[in-house]
Regions:
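Coil residues (strongly favoring Ser/Thr
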Residues: 4, 11-12, 190
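Acidic/histidine-rich, surface-exposed loop or edge segments in extracytoplasmic proteins
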Residues: 8-24, 80-82, 161-165
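Charged, low-complexity, helix-prone segments enriched in Lys/Glu/Asp/Gln
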Residues: 1-5, 41-44
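Feature captures C-terminal
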Residues: 31-34, 38-202
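Long, non-catalytic terminal segments
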Residues: 2-6, 16-23, 29-34
Length: 202
């Protein structure tokens, strides 16, 4: 049994053209994880007849447990990257909750902690978020509700992400992050590395 399990984990699932370090500045590994999460969850929802645009994906850097090697990526990487049983959830944030989220991200980024982020570019200056921060291509509209993709752990205030407590319309899924990563690799030969900035520190 151990030999057969080892053989499965040693299978090559994709090719990575670059090394992606889990602690790299601007977090390309986190950006990759956020982007695939948005795509996989939107597909999951569509299969259930739900058309929901996800504006932002936010996870925690502490949940990303290893780096991605350049070259062949083995199935074991999925379990090393994501050993937790985290499930995706969607929550709507607006106004002050969005500002609190930006401030949290800016403070952590200023000390070199870049949380996996998709759908936005956080601009920080002097340890605080700047109004140049954009969601999509647009600056924050405090009257608008934004749909944020995260995990059940963070929704409950994990990693001190307490701003999620001010969210509304929470939508739970039964899709685990690890399952989404596996599905991504099932239809991906060569990994696409995100090149757009998720953080800009001034």
């Amino acid at each position: 049994y151990a030999d057969s399990l080892s053989a499965v984990l040693d299978q090559t699932v994709a090719y990575s053209p670059e090394y992606l370090g889990k602690n790299d500045r601007n977090g390309a590994l986190g950006a990759w994880l956020a982007d695939l999460s948005i795509a996989e969850v939107e597909k999951y929802l569509k299969d259930k007849g739900i058309n929901e645009q996800i504006h932002i994906a936010l996870f925690n850097s502490g949940g990303v447990r290893t780096s991605m090697p350049q070259g062949d990526v083995k199935r074991s990487f999925i379990y090393e990257l994501m050993p937790f049983e985290n499930q995706y959830v969607l929550v709507r944030l607006k106004g002050q909750a969005m500002r609190d989220m930006f401030e949290y991200l800016a403070k952590d980024a200023s000390r070199g902690v870049f949380h996996p982020l998709g759908g936005m570019c956080l601009v920080a200056e002097g340890g605080h978020w700047s109004r140049e921060t954009t969601v999509g291509q647009w600056r924050l509209n405090p009257e608008r509700e934004y749909t944020v993709l995260t995990t059940d752990f963070l929704l409950k205030g994990g990693d001190n992400m307490n701003f999620f407590a001010d969210g509304t319309d929470v939508m739970a899924t039964d899709l685990k992050m690890r399952e989404a990563i596996m599905d991504y690799f099932s239809h991906t030969d060569t990994i696409t590395i995100p090149k757009d900035l998720r953080y800009e520190i001034k």
